[in-house]
């Protein structure tokens, strides 16, 4: 595995080890998650991956997995193993679809039909949120591995919005904090409240990766990974509340009635994925139910918040007062 000590990677390693696989993780050595205990660790800078190939290829390789192919590894990571490994697996994202460009507001439309399948139109614009810490757009990754498919058969897994323990983006932070603070209501911008996104609990996304690793039928195929149903943001917030045991209200309001920090200017575009291909071709099914996954995600998020200062709710209180 290239990478594997961040968010999704440790769960992939853990599940592969549980299957009895021999796992080598190449990473920068900044952290050694407990979940990866039992794997061989090789430390090095990704930009110098070629120098570490002898250490990584001491034993025969079946599959090489790049958890974060957006990071340059003397080029595209898995392609260094052409002629060495039998197959490759890369994790990209559903941001490759044109629908995401429409949602970002960099494509004037028209709104794209939902759900997207693996054959849906891809975006033509570069990602507007490509961070300075990334070298390749997900589209770059997919095109690069496709161009050399005769040398290495690579499975592409297009990941959803992922939630759960170890989430570096803290996607549940605002909601869980408000619930922990016993807020009577949580405000949502009306457009955000309607937005439907395909999500996936981290252990389930890891299981999708492991399913592809373990099944040769995945070679050269592209799969959407994620939950079979896509909740709106308002439905999602209520699901988080149910898992938390919060009895407050979800208050949906036009953005003109909201404080600036809660206004979310979004076009009328969802991003809902059809995940039937990986289910039908590889027999994928979730390991963890949504309520159970949310419970684990909430428990982890609460632990992160333990020593953090509380937010200022004054602008939200004023908005709630104005709505009554």
Question: Residues of each region from the PLM?
Answer:
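NAD(P)H-binding glycine-rich loop region in Rossmannoid oxidoreductase-like domains
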Residues: 5, 30-90, 96-99
């Amino acid at each position: 595995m290239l990478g594997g000590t961040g968010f999704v990677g440790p769960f992939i390693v853990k599940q592969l080890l549980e299957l009895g696989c021999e796992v080598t993780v190449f990473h920068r050595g900044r952290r050694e998650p407990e979940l990866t205990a039992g794997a061989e660790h090789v430390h090095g800078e990704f930009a110098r991956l070629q120098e570490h190939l002898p250490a990584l290829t001491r034993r025969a390789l079946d599959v090489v997995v790049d958890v974060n192919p957006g990071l340059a590894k003397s080029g595209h990571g898995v392609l260094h193993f052409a002629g060495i490994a039998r197959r490759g697996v890369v994790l990209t994202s559903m941001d490759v679809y044109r629908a995401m460009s429409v949602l970002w507001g960099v494509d004037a439309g028209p709104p794209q039909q939902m759900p997207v399948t693996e054959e849906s139109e891809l975006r033509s614009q570069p990602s507007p949120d490509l961070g300075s810490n990334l070298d390749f757009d997900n589209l770059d990754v997919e095109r690069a591995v496709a161009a050399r498919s005769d040398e290495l058969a690579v499975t592409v897994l297009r990941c959803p919005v992922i939630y759960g323990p170890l989430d570096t983006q803290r996607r549940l932070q605002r909601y869980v904090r408000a619930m922990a603070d016993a807020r009577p209501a949580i405000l949502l911008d009306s457009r955000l409240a309607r937005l439907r996104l395909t999500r996936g609990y981290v252990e389930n996304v890891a299981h999708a990766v492991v399913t592809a690793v373990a099944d040769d039928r995945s070679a050269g195929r592209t799969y959407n990974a994620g939950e079979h149903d896509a909740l709106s943001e308002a439905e999602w917030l209520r699901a988080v509340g149910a898992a938390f045991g919060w009895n407050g209200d979800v208050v949906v309001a036009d953005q003109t009635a909201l404080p600036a920090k809660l206004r979310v200017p979004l076009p009328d575009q969802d991003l809902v994925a059809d995940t039937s291909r990986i289910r039908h071709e590889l027999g994928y099914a979730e390991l963890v139910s949504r309520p159970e996954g949310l419970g684990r995600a909430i428990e982890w998020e609460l632990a992160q918040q333990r020593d953090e200062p509380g937010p200022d709710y004054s602008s939200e209180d004023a908005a709630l007062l104005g709505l009554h």
